[in-house]
């Protein structure tokens, strides 16, 4: 069985307040700060900034 890695699941939530989100993983050791990335929001059909949120 493989050892547990140090990657943590995160949710990227749209700043356009549409409720749309992506899920991904990130390495906490290499990127301790909150992630912000520009991705496509299909609800508003534009590229918007997505901010990191914890998965409940």
Curated annotation (Swiss-Prot):
It comes from the Bacteria. InterPro entries: Ribosomal_bL33, Ribosomal_bL33_CS, Ribosomal_bL33_sf, Ribosomal_zn-bd. Transmembrane segments: none annotated. GO terms for biological process: translation. GO terms for molecular function: structural constituent of ribosome. GO terms for cellular component: cytosolic large ribosomal subunit. Keywords: Ribonucleoprotein, Ribosomal protein. Belongs to the bacterial ribosomal protein bL33 family. This is Large ribosomal subunit protein bL33. It comes from Glaesserella parasuis serovar 5 (strain SH0165) (Haemophilus parasuis).
